[in-house]
Each structure stands twice: as structure tokens, then as C-alpha cells.
Amino acid sequence: MYNEEEKMYKKVVVFGGGTGSSYLLKGLKDFPVDITAVITVSDNGRSTGKLRKEFNTPAVGDIRKVITALSEIDDPIKKMVEYRFNTSSDLNGHAVGNLILTAMLDITGS
């Protein structure tokens, strides 16, 4: 339920995916607006592409970017979620946040 102050906020809906949406949303969160983001889940690049193929899941990379852009979590945690492994192992190129979101999809089944 909205309180009186929240009723005065303009409602902004952002449709998209990719880096552009996360930058736009990061900027919008500093304004008194009610933000809704509709993010595509069809990306197939790097970590997301590997995880989609391996686990047959929606693309989580753009969702991860939007979550960190809109969140109020501390910078060290944001850096950890956005961190990409640079190794010669199978983790190479994976973002920690993508692995976490994929695990949540696997745990919840949705």
C-alpha cells in the first residue's frame, strides 16, 4: 500500500536489457520516481551464454546488472557480485552474481 508521499512519485517503466538499461536505472534511482524495470532474458554472451547452455535457464546477466544498479548494497558487495573470474578453470569469465542467480533458479525451479 502506498503512503501519501509515494502517490506523488511519477511512475517510470524501463524496457530493455544490456548495459544501457542498468546505467539508465542507476541514474533514475537518484530521482523521486517509482521505477519498474522490464528486462529481457535473451542475452547469450560470455557467462550468461555458458550458464544458459549448461543449465537451460533464462539469461541472468542483465538481471544481475539491474539488481546491482538499483540496490543500496555497499560497494564491496556490488564489486563481489560483478566480479568475473580470470582463471584457466571452468569458472573463467563467469560473474559471481550470475552464478548466484543461476543457483537460485536451480533451487527454486523458477
Give the label of every model feature segment.
Residues M1-K7:
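Short, Lys/Arg-enriched N-terminal segments with co-localized hydrophobic residues
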Residues K7-F55, L105:
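N-terminal phosphate-binding or glycine-rich loops at protein starts, especially the Walker A/P-loop
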Residues I39-G109:
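Glycine-rich nucleotide/cofactor/substrate-binding loop typically near the N-terminus or early
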